Design a protein with these regions (language model features):
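Hydrophobic alpha-helical transmembrane segments in integral membrane proteins
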Residues: 1-11, 17
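Extracytosolic and intramembrane catalytic regions of membrane-associated proteins
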Residues: 13-164
């Protein structure tokens, strides 16, 4: 899984062997120069197709190694949750959903406490679509409670997987 370092856009590539599925916003896919420069270069280095299957943030999708339902994505044993305008956690649940990664995207008001009230998060990822001043607030709040984090503004994040 690769979370690309892109300004104003979100792109997560789920790679298995020579196949890959790209989770991306429609604005990114319409931005040919960003796709050519930022995505195709990475795909070329990994000998991946320049034409992956693309799924949107509002789409549900399932195949033999990836499942996306609403804001949750299961990829070969890892669980990723999205935190954006469309998806946040319901306060009505009486348990914390365990997730490996929680990806904050778009202009979300920094509220790490709400995140940890709803999710048992191993790592918070602050995406490049989050404005810099908000990203700094998310990171400072994560530091304050000892929550591991990664700021995509520092570069792409690649997580290896062991395929079973």
């Amino acid at each position: 899984m690769t979370v690309f370092s892109l300004r104003k856009h979100t792109a997560v590539d789920f790679v298995r062997g020579g196949e890959h599925i790209l989770l991306a916003d429609t604005a990114l896919m319409a931005d040919e120069s960003t796709v050519d420069y930022s995505l195709k270069g990475a795909w070329s280095k990994r000998n991946l197709s320049f034409h992956p299957q693309v799924i949107g943030f509002d789409d549900d999708y399932t195949n033999n190694y990836l499942s996306k339902k609403s804001n949750l994505i299961s990829f070969n044993g890892m669980l990723l949750a999205l935190w954006d305008d469309a998806y946040q956690f319901s306060d009505s649940l009486n348990y914390r959903l365990p997730v490996d990664f929680l990806l904050v995207r778009e202009k979300q008001k920094p509220d790490v406490q709400s995140v940890v009230n709803g999710y048992d998060v191993k790592m918070l990822i602050v995406d490049g679509s989050v404005p810099r001043y908000l990203a700094e607030k998310w990171i400072n709040q994560a530091k304050a409670i000892g929550l591991p984090y990664y700021n995509i503004g520092d570069g792409a994040m690649e997580v290896g997987c062991t395929f079973k």
